Amino acid sequence: METKQERETGRSSPDPSPRKLIRRAATWEISDSDNEEETNKPQTESRKGPIVNIEATDQLLGVQKDPAQQPDVEEKTKNLVLPPPTSTTPSPTRRSRKKKTPEQVAAEQEQAEEKKRQRELKRQEKAQKKELEKIERERRKETNLALKLLRPDQCGKYMVVKVDAGLLEDAGSEDVLEALRVAEYNYSIEPHSVPQSISWRREMPADWTCIEGMDMKEEEEDQLLVLVEPKSYLSSVRTYAQAPYYFCVGNEMEEIPGSVFSIPAKNPHKKVTLVIIGLQEYRWCERLSRQIQRQSLDAAEGRDSNKDQSATRATRQQIQEALVFLQLHYNTEVLCLDTWKELGQHVCAVTKSIAQRPFRKHWEAQTFSFCTSAGSWRGWGPRGVLTGLPLTWRRQIQQLNRVSPAMAAVVSQAYPSPQLLMQAYSACGSDRERMSLLTDLRIPQDNNTGVTQKAEDPREVADIAQEGDQVPGRERRIGPDLSRRIWLLMTSKNPELVLDLNS
């Protein structure tokens, strides 16, 4: 009974304590029935929104509530839930993949293999390109090293002058050997098939690499120099004068004993040069001896002997005819010298020419050094200067004889390309007008000295033609000669035409 009364008094007490009214659980107790409800009603729980603690929210906002109403609020908040959202997005459905056919799988595999092959081919091409570039660099390096041995200042070291032992019988041969020693050329004394002759041989180092496109051979050169006595040469000329037609038939001249004309026929693979020392002196002495003989004899006997001697000696006309015959039929030159010293100088000059022959042929086959090659990244000078076609065109004009950089600059400024010059030629009415088209182009002069401007570097004469109108004083022109040569250069179809009449 007391317990019930105490409960009734506690409920009817007007001012109960807040601690007794609000009781908070330290922990949440979950019973077995809750689990059963969750399993039985999964959809209803998922639809319920999150539970909001209004009491904690009011405390944060500073709202004071009536303590008498707090138990009811607590009971309401336990079952209070947020309404479900009005717009719900449906969960994405998993896309079902279509099963590929075997043909599609095979096509995809083939496409993947094709891409793999393409990548492999590109990789191989790239590696091959690098290997070719490496080989090209090595080849250029070897070529440059080989060209160093063939430069004009180095090529003479590998030439050997072969002198026949019979040539040393004359006392003047010492002048020839002394000239070779002064020029620092190697020589050797060896017996030759042709007596009193000189030949040349090139001896390259063992580690020298042959350059592609260069005709190099480590053997005797095709030049042969033969020393001929004046008496033997004049005797051969008299024999030729007596039977000129007999000499022109094949190699019949080989049967004539003592004839120097048979030497070129016996050596067809050689470029033979006949050297005669003291021919004029010998003929003068021969003429003097005949005069002495005529004076010692009687008048009648002298006339008879004069007829006999005139029939046996060679005249100047016969000597000239023999020279023409040797030049035309055997491509043989005859060199008349006065002293052995001149012969030594000639041998040194021929040695130098033979030594430089491969180097000259190699550079003649190359393009101009001022042209930019296809694979080169460097131009001619920095940006902004004259490059490419204008520079090549200017240098081409400057290749002509007696053409200064200033003259070439004037022509290239008036007609910046060869095609423009050809169009100007086609616009002319006659050949005379075309020939004199460039005659009146003025060459500018220096303001201070009045001398025509000169420039070693074509970059320094880029604006020479533009300054010509402002230069006072006497002015030079291109002139008719250079105008005619340029016209012939651009229009002539004759490869053997000589442009410079003064050369």
Curated annotation (Swiss-Prot):
InterPro entries for the chain: EME1/EME2_C, ERCC4_domain, Mms4/EME1/EME2, XPF_nuclease_EME2
Residue ranges of the region described as Disordered: 1-135
Region (Nuclease-like domain): 70-366
Feature: compositional bias, Basic and acidic residues: 1-10, 38-48, 112-135
Family: Belongs to the EME1/MMS4 family.
Superkingdom, taxonomy of origin: Eukaryota
Keywords, ordered alphabetically: Coiled coil, DNA damage, DNA recombination, DNA repair, Nucleus
Protein role: Non-catalytic subunit of the structure-specific, heterodimeric DNA endonuclease MUS81-EME2 which is involved in the maintenance of genome stability. In the complex, EME2 is required for DNA cleavage, participating in DNA recognition and bending. MUS81-EME2 cleaves 3'-flaps and nicked Holliday junctions, and exhibit limited endonuclease activity with 5' flaps and nicked double-stranded DNAs. MUS81-EME2 which is active during the replication of DNA is more specifically involved in replication fork processing.
Record organism: Xenopus tropicalis
Stretches assigned to coiled coil: 103-151
Subunit structure: Part of the heterodimeric MUS81-EME2 complex; the complex forms specifically during the DNA replication phase of the cell cycle.
Single GO cellular component term: nucleus
Main location per the UniProt record: nucleus
Region Helix-hairpin-helix (2HhH): start-end pairs: 388-503
Disulfide-bond pairs as recorded: none
PANTHER family linked: CROSSOVER JUNCTION ENDONUCLEASE EME2-RELATED (PTHR21077:SF6), EME1 PROTEIN (PTHR21077)
Protein name: Structure-specific endonuclease subunit EME2
Gene Ontology biological-process entries: DNA recombination; DNA repair
